[in-house]
Every structure is written in structure tokens, then in C-alpha cells.
């Protein structure tokens, strides 16, 4: 079963439950991609979209005969697009195409009438890219408590203290960057102070199963169809494989339940409604996105040593080769540039110092982050990188010491 997990697993037992009412559902079969051709799976299936109690949107496909859910993908706004494949002779083949990366899922309509096909397509895109606000569907679970409960030290500290480094990074990603500059607006001690006083994050394991990411502009296209007839099933369609791109990882962590019914969606809602203020003292902010342009990064990324250090951070997968080209595509994508600009603005707010402590950054970098000095932060990180001995140097030194001990 192909399952894409959330980056932030719920910390509240039972909060991953879902409402029994689907946002959209229609009968449709799967199609398998083999090489550049898609062929229909004759099983009876059901495509449905549901919003779970943690406010996440799931795109699912299940076998109507066995009841087995084979695909359960967590989709975020602007991750993907559901559209008809015009090259298919039957006109009833649709593809869930992810905007960042090469992943595509094909389906063929099994509803007896065709008059609702386009309406189903419209509803799918509406639910995936404009999901309903939490609580508007009347689902039980997270809507029962108020956001103000997050202001208490016990709730927030329990929530944040049990996050892994990768999970904390989500807070400075596009989904949660809206309000890092206004952290002081939280009631109680504030998120920044809680980050500084919270314990080390729990251990976590991650995998790259989430289908979409802030990665690279896709270049995929669908070519003309070629027929391979099947009874009551669409003809197979030929598709040109796009250049693969990274997909963001999803993390799972093992953590104790907080003392209050705290949901991460509440925290993200607070962060998303805050505004990043101007730099301290009215000083001019440094926009990292305008500094780290593709032209400037090109000669750096051409360095084999740099490529070797960056390759391990690319997501792994069957259709996601870890190549130097993928590094180039990722770092020059509009999504990455947008995330870089948002991180730059949040860093300039002077509120990220405690968060930087969580990552074990040098004191100079933490101090610069507390001051909102982006330039000083960059210099501190550069100096720290220069001071760290290279792996080869460390090995040579160790060998030399062993030789001396033998003498």
C-alpha cells in the first residue's frame, strides 16, 4: 500500500481519526505506469478525499471489492492538479499530477454516466487546493478546544519539545513561516522562550514518502495515446517521463502525549496569521533569495565536493535519482526561492535565536539570529564551516597518530 504520511504526526491519541463523510467520492479504477505507457487496472475502485481530524487532506483510492485502501496520500495546497488526459480515446482518463516532481497517478472513470466527470474533477481540485477550514465540516476532535490553550507553557513546551529537527524545520517552511516574527504575540512565555527552554527533541526517523514538495518546476508532458483496448476500460496512453525531482520527506516521531489536547494544526494556524515585522532598528533586511541567485550558485554547485555534501539531502526513491542535476533543479526552483525569501524574513525578525539553539548552531550564529542580523548569521555559519576539519583531514590525522603510537 502506498501511503504518504504527514510531516508532523499528531501528538494526541485518536486525533488522526476521520469523519465518515467524504469531501468527494466517485467510482474510478487505477492505471499502472509501465515505462512510458499506462494500462488500466480492471478492478472496481473508489477515489475519495477526506479531511481527518488533524485537518490534513487525504487523497485515497480503494478496491471496492476487497475494501483495501491501496493509496492514501496526504496532499497540501498547490501540491498537485487533477485533470483529464486529452490524449486518451475514451476521454475518461484522469491524472493526479504533482507540480514538483515526476509522480503521477492515473485513473479511469467507472461511473456509468459521463455527465459528472468534469464536476468530479473540479471538486477534487477544489478540495485539494482550497481545503475547508478545520471544524467547518462538523468533524469531532480538534475543534473542541481553543487556540488559546497553546499559550500555556505546558502545552507548547510539550508539543515543541517532542519535535525532531526535521519537524522543527517545518515551522520555518512555507506552511508555517507566516508568523515567526510575531512569536511574542503568543500568550504566556511565548514560543521563542519555550523553544529556548524546551528539552532536546525526540528521536525520529524519516522517509521520503510524501508526494509533493517545495522542490522543482516540473517539465512533464503527456504525449499522444496509443490504443491497447480492454473491456469497459480505457485505452492505454503513452506518456513521456518527466525529469524527476525531489519530494519532501515526511517524519514520524515517538513522543509522549501532552497534558493538554494540543494539535499542531492549531500552532500552524497561529503562525500563519502573524506578520513578520521589519528588521530591528529599521535596518535594511538582507533577502537571501536575491543573494543566492542561480547565476551566483551555478559555479558553486559545479564543485564536486559541494555536490557530494548536498546529495545526501535529496529525497530517495525509485523515480528520484540523486544526481547533481537534481541539486541544480531544486535550488533554482521558484518554490525553493520563495522558501528562502520567507526564511530570510523570519531570520531578520530576530525571533529565531532559540530555534537555532535546537539545531546546535555556534554561539555566534545564535547571537546573530537573536539580533536579526542575516549577514552576521551567514558569516558565523561560514566561519564555523571553515573551522570544522574535513573528513579526509581527520582520517589522515588519525592514521598519523596510530603510526606514532606504533613507533
Curated annotation (Swiss-Prot):
Compartment(s) of residence: Cytoplasm; Nucleus
Record's compositionally biased regions (Polar residues): 249-259
GO biological process, one term: ovarian follicle development
Glycyl lysine isopeptide (Lys-Gly) (interchain with G-Cter in ubiquitin) cross-link, chain position(s): 34
Keywords noted in UniProt: Acetylation, Cytoplasm, Isopeptide bond, Nucleus, Phosphoprotein, Proteasome, Ubl conjugation
Region (Disordered): 130-150, 196-259, 381-407
Pru domain segment(s): 18-131
Residues bearing the modification N-acetylthreonine: 2
Biased composition (Low complexity): 137-150, 196-248
Maturation and modification: Ubiquitinated by UBE3C in response to proteotoxic stress.
Disulfide pattern: none
Modified residues (Phosphoserine): 15, 140, 211, 405
Key word GTP-binding present: no
Keyword Ubl conjugation: yes
Region ranges (Interaction with UCHL5): 362-407
Main location group: cytoplasm
GO molecular function: endopeptidase activator activity; molecular function inhibitor activity; protease binding; proteasome binding
PROSITE patterns named among the record's database cross-references: DEUBAD, PRU
Compositional bias segments (type: Basic and acidic residues): 387-398
UniProt domain comment: The Pru (pleckstrin-like receptor for ubiquitin) domain mediates interactions with PSMD1 and ubiquitin. Preferential binding to the proximal subunit of 'Lys-48'-linked diubiquitin allows UCHL5 access to the distal subunit.
Protein family per UniProt: Belongs to the ADRM1 family.
Record's subunit section: Component of the 19S proteasome regulatory particle complex. The 26S proteasome consists of a 20S core particle (CP) and two 19S regulatory subunits (RP). Interacts with the proteasomal scaffolding protein PSMD1. Interacts with deubiquitinase UCHL5; this interaction activates the auto-inhibited UCHL5 by deoligomerizing it. Interacts with UBQLN2 and ubiquitin.
Role of this protein: Component of the 26S proteasome, a multiprotein complex involved in the ATP-dependent degradation of ubiquitinated proteins. This complex plays a key role in the maintenance of protein homeostasis by removing misfolded or damaged proteins, which could impair cellular functions, and by removing proteins whose functions are no longer required. Therefore, the proteasome participates in numerous cellular processes, including cell cycle progression, apoptosis, or DNA damage repair. Within the complex, functions as a proteasomal ubiquitin receptor.
Protein name: Proteasomal ubiquitin receptor ADRM1
Organism for this UniProt entry: Rattus norvegicus (Rat)
Lineage of producing organism: Eukaryota, Metazoa, Chordata, Craniata, Vertebrata
Amino acid at each position: 500500500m502506498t501511503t504518504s504520511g504527514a510531516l508532523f504526526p499528531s501528538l494526541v491519541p485518536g486525533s488522526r481519526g476521520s469523519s465518515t463523510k467524504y469531501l468527494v467520492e466517485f467510482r474510478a479504477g487505477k492505471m499502472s505506469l509501465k515505462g512510458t505507457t499506462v494500462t488500466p487496472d480492471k478492478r472496481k475502485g473508489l477515489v475519495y478525499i477526506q479531511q481527518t481530524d488533524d485537518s490534513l487532506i487525504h487523497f485515497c483510492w480503494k478496491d471496492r471489492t476487497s475494501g483495501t485502501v491501496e493509496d492514501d496520500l496526504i496532499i497540501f495546497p498547490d501540491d498537485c492538479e487533477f485533470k483529464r488526459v486529452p490524449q486518451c480515446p475514451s476521454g475518461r482518463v484522469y491524472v493526479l499530477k504533482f507540480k514538483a516532481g515526476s509522480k503521477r497517478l492515473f485513473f479511469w472513470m467507472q461511473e456509468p454516466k459521463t455527465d459528472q466527470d468534469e464536476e468530479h474533477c473540479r471538486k477534487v481540485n477544489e478540495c485539494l487546493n482550497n481545503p475547508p477550514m478545520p471544524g467547518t465540516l462538523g468533524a469531532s476532535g480538534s475543534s473542541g478546544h481553543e487556540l488559546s490553550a497553546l499559550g500555556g507553557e505546558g502545552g507548547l513546551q510539550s508539543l515543541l519539545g517532542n519535535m525532531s529537527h526535521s519537524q522543527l524545520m517545518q515551522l520555518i517552511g512555507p506552511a508555517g513561516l507566516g508568523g515567526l516574527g510575531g512569536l511574542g504575540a503568543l500568550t504566556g512565555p511565548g514560543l521563542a522562550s519555550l523553544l529556548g527552554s524546551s528539552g532536546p527533541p525526540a528521536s525520529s526517523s524519516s522517509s521520503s514518502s510524501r508526494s509533493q514538495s517545495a522542490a522543482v518546476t516540473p517539465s512533464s508532458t503527456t504525449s499522444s495515446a496509443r490504443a491497447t483496448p480492454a473491456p469497459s476500460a480505457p485505452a492505454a496512453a503513452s506518456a513521456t517521463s518527466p525529469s524527476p525531482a525531489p519530494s519532501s520527506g515526511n517524519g514520524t516521531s515517538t513522543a509522549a502525549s501532552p497534558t493538554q489536547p494540543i494539535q499542531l494544526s492549531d500552532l500552524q494556524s497561529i503562525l500563519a496569521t502573524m506578520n513578520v515585522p521589519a528588521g530591528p532598528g529599521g535596518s535594511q533586511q538582507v533577502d537571501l533569495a536575491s543573494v543566492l541567485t542561480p547565476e551566483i550558485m551555478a559555479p558553486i554547485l559545479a564543485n564536486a565536493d559541494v555536490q557530494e555534501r548536498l546529495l545526501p539531502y535529496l529525497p530517495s526513491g525509485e523515480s528520484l535519482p540523486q544526481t547533481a542535476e537534481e541539486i541544480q533543479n531544486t535550488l533554482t526552483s521558484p518554490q525553493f526561492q520563495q522558501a528562502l525569501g520567507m526564511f530570510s524574513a523570519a531570520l531578520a525578525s530576530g525571533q529565531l535565536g532559540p530555534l537555532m539553539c535546537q539545531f546546535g548552531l555556534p554561539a555566534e550564529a545564535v547571537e546573530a539570529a537573536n539580533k536579526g542580523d542575516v549577514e552576521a548569521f551567514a558569516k558565523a555559519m561560514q566561519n564555523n564551516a571553515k573551522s570544522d576539519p574535513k573528513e579526509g583531514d581527520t582520517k589522515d590525522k588519525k592514521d598519523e597518530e596510530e603510526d606514532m603510537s606504533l613507533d
